Every structure is written in C-alpha cells, then in structure tokens.
Amino acid sequence: MEKTICELFAGVGGFRLGFDRLNTGWRTTWFSQWEPGASKQWAHDCYVKHFGECTDLNGELHTGDDISTVNKDAIPSHTLLVGGFPCQDYSVAHTLASSKGIEGKKGVLWWQIRDILIAKNAPFCIFENVDRLLKSPASQRGRDFGIILSCLNDLDYSVEWRVVNAAIYGAAQRRRRTFIFAYKNSTEYGQKMNDEDSTQLITRTGLMARAFPVRDAVKLRTTSLPKDVVETSDSFAFLFDNAGYMHKGVIYTTPVNEIEEEPILLGEILEHGAAESFYITDDKRMAKWIYLKGAKKIQRKSASGHEYTFSEGPIAFPDPWDRPGRTMLTSESTLNRSTHVVTDPGTGKLRTLTPVEAERLQGFDDNWTN
C-alpha cells in the first residue's frame, strides 16, 4: 500500500510535520488551506514556504482556493485523508430533486470532506475537531457527531474516536480535541478489527488505544444509527463518551481513563527575555488584566428581556510554570481572559507569550511561522 496523504484545512502544516517527524515513509500528494475573508493567506504561504506547492491531476494550483470550489475528481489519489475541521451546524435535509439526496448547510466544511471521500475513496482518514463535537448541539446532544458517523457508515467506513488531552500524553498544552480514525471495512486493518471484541478494540487493540493508552473501560454502552443521514439529523440524540467505536451502524462507547505521561511544563518553553512590547508596563492595562483573569458575577439581560447572573471563576495570574499551558486560542496575545500571561524567567516581569513560545506550545519548531 502506497503511503500517500491528502491534508485538508492544513493551517501551517501540523499534520504533515507530525508525519514527517515519524520518518515512516508517508508522502503528502496534495493539501488545501484557505482562510475565508482574509486579504492575505498567511497560513497557506507558511505551509508552502516549508513544504512547497502541490498541483492537482490537471497540473493546476488550487491549494490556496476555497475547497468548495475545487474539482474533487482532480485531487490526487491518496491512502490517508487528514484534516482538522471546525464544529459547525451539520444538520441536513433531503434535496428537492431527490428524496435520497441530502443537502447540508452552505459553508459547513464536513460536506466538502464527504465529497472528497466519495470522489477519491480513501482507505483511511484521520480527522480532528473540538471536544464539544460529541455533545453538540445543545438542543439535540450528540446529533452532529451522529451525522458524521452516519455519513462514514454510508461510505462503508468503521470509526474509532477518542477525546485526547494533549498534555496527558506528553505535550506542552492542556488541549482537548476529538480525534476520529475511519477505515474502509474492506482494508486488511478493517477485516482484522471487525473480528475484535469492541471493548478490547477501544481499550487495547485499536489504533487509538495503541496511540493513546488507557486503563480498562468503565462501562460500555451501545446504540444504533438511524437508517439514513437525514433521519439522524432529525431525530438522533445520544450521549457519547470520550472513547468509542462504530461498525456497520452500531455504536459502542465508554468512558476511559488515560495512562498519563510526563508533560512538557510551561516553564520549559519560556524564553529568557523578550521585546519590550510583550511586557505589561501600563498600570491601566495591568488593572484590566487583573479584572479579566479574576472571578466575577455580572447581572445581564438576554435579548428576550430575561435577567440572569453571568459568573466565571478565576484563572491563575500569572500562568504557573509548573503546569502545561492552557488551551491556546487564535486570540492569543490580545488583551483577553484566555491569553497566557507569564513571569519572564530572565527579567521577572509579567508579559504575554512570544511567537516562538506560542510555536513551542503548539509543538512546532522555533520560528516556524516567521
């Protein structure tokens, strides 16, 4: 089997860098990275700087285009489709033209993934999403993940999933993400796993269990997907646990407890000294930081006129050196509650993270995004 990869929503190349570091012969044949509404495609340009461009089967360059406009048949063939896609509204309806066709909401990237799977028939897939995917939407818990499973089931994939806190497995960031591994039932791996006991697959023998070791399952629960994706969208609700497996429309899920590894601590990634612009030197800004990081209760009124109390607990200020970093958001370094504020090891003064520290927190090499 040829070890080829297609990388969607590639960002600055995290998936590709991870496979390259494994040094096991995987080769990326095509990628896609496009940021809607941006005048400059910084992430795409960073990716190309490190890895170069990829042409499609027509010899054309479309890696920086909106994936919804890309000819899926022209994407080079690949063994593994990977990508981190956002948690969006996955609800669907029957198309007007056909009661068997389905139509998702415009702009929802899952449907682009599905179209590529139909066009290219990749034997294996690895996807990443936020941890709340398993519980969304609030009005119909589990529906969105059920739709994804239903789509994959219709295309003859079985699926393993796990919610992973990166810091528990040795990374520098307490970042919880849902990882999804799907494989065609006709593959050698699929035929082998289809004979496995579901609990053993989730906790011992499956890819997720071997990559992210856990202790024994707590309690296995099962349910079945509705007959089609539209019915799943309309009526399916289920409380997914942090680990599970789906085969032929039957879902098996259980809470699992991770076997922890030694994490990288925030203090280990900090530089000694930084440019003056990173330091908090203004008294008014310092007061704002203290307010944002502190506990608070605020009376608010909803659009409908309902009054309620908004409350939130405190965040450590500054962030402690002896723990992994918190989840880093795209708003990192701006004046907001989620931004890391650290005591500089060299100066003893409070400041935000430098670009190099942010790269280290995400597992990239220093100056990767320069």
Where do the language-model regions lie?
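A short helix->loop->beta-strand "cap" motif at the edges of active sites that frequently abuts
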Residues: 120-123, 157, 176, 336
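Flexible, glycine-/basic-rich loop-and-beta segments that form/coincide
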Residues: 171-250
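C-terminal target-recognition/interaction regions appended to catalytic cores
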Residues: 247-370
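Core alpha/beta nucleotide-donor-binding catalytic domains of modification enzymes
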Residues: 1-124, 130-146, 150-153
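Residues that flank catalytic or metal-binding motifs in active/ligand-binding sites
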Residues: 148, 160, 174-178, 324, ...
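Short catalytic/ligand-binding loop motif for oxyanion handling, primarily in non-cytosolic enzymes
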Residues: 16-17, 88-92, 133-136, 170-173, ...
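Conserved S-adenosyl-L-methionine
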Residues: 64, 131, 156-168
